[in-house]
Every structure is written in structure tokens, then in C-alpha cells.
């Protein structure tokens, strides 16, 4: 069944686009039937770390308060079950170590967790920009905090799987780069990931050509979603069991 009229009135986001790529049936449940999902371990962990960095960058928490706050709230807010006890312990320790030695680049902070509404690919979009900053030379950076352990670009003649994954996640920052230009009058000079679990900073120069490619990807994907009628489920064990927030309402989960 198609839901053209409902879909055409939507405000889009990077996560709304990638949810369809993850699983069309998940997208149907979440955005058409509005099933209230239940965040799982990885999502809860990412939300806690984002909240802590927001509070630190806005002066609500001091550096000395970060680890005690983190440990206290990890125990109370991370209620989802980790895939294994080893992963649970690893994530807890990686977060603790990161916050213990936290060090952001010395730049002027312009925006923190900035809610943006803008047009992209001919459609209304929204997004939350984790951090926008400017260095002493006036170069503008937009930064996204990521729990995923992305790797810096290899610069090999043939892109590695890690390079392909990096480009996939950079789509989000290119969407935000368009928003920054629309709202603040200039494109960022650099797109940046703060991969906090591994304490890895990945910085990529902005490319107008790449942004145009992302815009075309978004436009094509929205067209696909609008014309979708089958809404097939992508049954993949790890995703369904540990990442999908509507799995408990999904009749396909028992097939795994």
C-alpha cells in the first residue's frame, strides 16, 4: 500500500532517510503507523554521551564533573541490554576514559546542539547540529559526535570498506552543511567526526560537488520512499535484535 499524501507532507531528516535503507518495514512502523519505539543499549549510550558533551560545551558541567556524572547516569539511563557483558563493560570503560581525558580543539564555539529547519533536495528538512566552531584563521567546522568507531580515510587508489562507510556517514554532515549555508550564509570549511569511544577525530574538507551528490541521493531516496508499496522487512539478526527500536512490535522478529 502507498502513502503518498502522508509522505509528501513530511519534514525529513538524515535518520528518516537511512531508516528506510535499514528496513522499509521499520520505516513504515515508525513514520506511518507512528509506533513508539523503545531505545536499546547502543542508542541509549549514544544519547547519554551526546547529553554530557552538550552540557560540557555549554558550561553546565565542568571537566571534573564529567566522569562522576557519566558513571551515575550510565547505571540509571542505560537500561537496554547489551549484546554481551563484554560489550557492556567495554562501552562503559571507553566512555569513562574519553571523558577523563576529554580535550576539544581550541576553537571558538558558535553553536551547540543547534536545531535547524531548512530546505534540501526540494523538501523540508530538520537536523540537530552537535557543534559548530571556528578556528583562529576563521575556518568553520561542523562536528558530529559519533559512538561508531569510524576510521580516517585511507587515501588508497581503491577505497576501502572503511572509506565507503565514512562516506556514508558524511552524508549527514553534507546535509547539515547545506543548512549552515542557508541559515548562516556560508559553507563550512571542514566536516568533522568526534568518534568518542575510540577518541578519534576525523576531519574532511568540504566539497560542493560531494554535497550535490548527497542532495541527489536524498532526492532519489525520497522518491523511492514515496512510491513504495511493498514495505519489505530486512531481516538481519544484529540489526533487528540490538538496533531496531520497534522490534518488539514487529511480527517478523520471531523469524530470526
Give short role names for the model-derived ranges.
Residues 1-256:
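RecB-family 4Fe-4S metal-dependent nuclease core
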